[in-house]
Structures are given as structure tokens and as C-alpha cells.
């Protein structure tokens, strides 16, 4: 079965293309952070997979970078 126990949490880890998209847009972590109202450290943590953004922050990032959710995030 695809999702069982502890494996489910691991398999549902949200991954992202945030760093690639941000650099394509010629934005620093600090610039993007200011645009979306979070700290630079939060952007860094999202990019490295240490932190999963809330649904609201994920949507704000998509709007700020003019990308669809599936262009920025994946499982």
C-alpha cells in the first residue's frame, strides 16, 4: 500500500523549486522574503526543505513569483 504509518509522513514531504525560480527571477532570499512578509531565514529554510510553508505562504510565494502551485511545489 502506498501510504502507511511513518512512511506516509515521509512520502508527503513537500518539495520545491523555490531556489531555482527565485534565482531565475533575479531575486535574493532577502528580496523575496520582504516581498512575501517573512524572514530571509524562512525562505532559506523552505529552499533547503527544513521548513514546509503553510498553505497561505505557499500561495503568496506563487503569486509573488507568478507561478502555479505545481510549478513551485511537488511531492
Residue ranges of model-derived segments:
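Recognition helix of helix-turn-helix/homeodomain-like DNA-binding domains
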Residues: 38-51
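A short, Lys/Arg-rich alpha-helix, primarily the initiator
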Residues: 2-24
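Short alpha-helical elements of helix-turn-helix
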Residues: 16, 40, 55-59
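DNA major-groove recognition helix of helix-turn-helix/homeodomain DNA-binding modules
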Residues: 56-71
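Short basic helix-loop element that most often maps to the first helix and adjoining turn
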Residues: 16-35, 60
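Conserved hydrophobic/aromatic packing and binding residues within compact polymer-binding modules
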Residues: 18, 32-33, 43-46, 72
Amino acid at each position: 500500500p502506498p501510504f502507511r504509518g511513518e512512511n506516509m509522513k515521509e512520502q508527503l514531504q513537500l518539495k520545491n523549486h523555490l531556489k531555482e525560480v527565485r534565482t531565475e527571477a533575479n531575486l535574493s532570499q532577502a528580496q523575496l522574503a520582504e516581498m512575501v512578509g517573512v524572514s530571509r531565514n524562512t525562505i532559506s529554510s523552505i529552499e533547503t526543505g527544513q521548513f514546509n510553508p503553510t498553505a497561505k505562504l505557499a500561495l503568496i510565494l506563487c503569486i509573488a513569483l507568478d507561478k502555479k502551485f505545481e510549478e513551485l511545489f511537488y511531492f
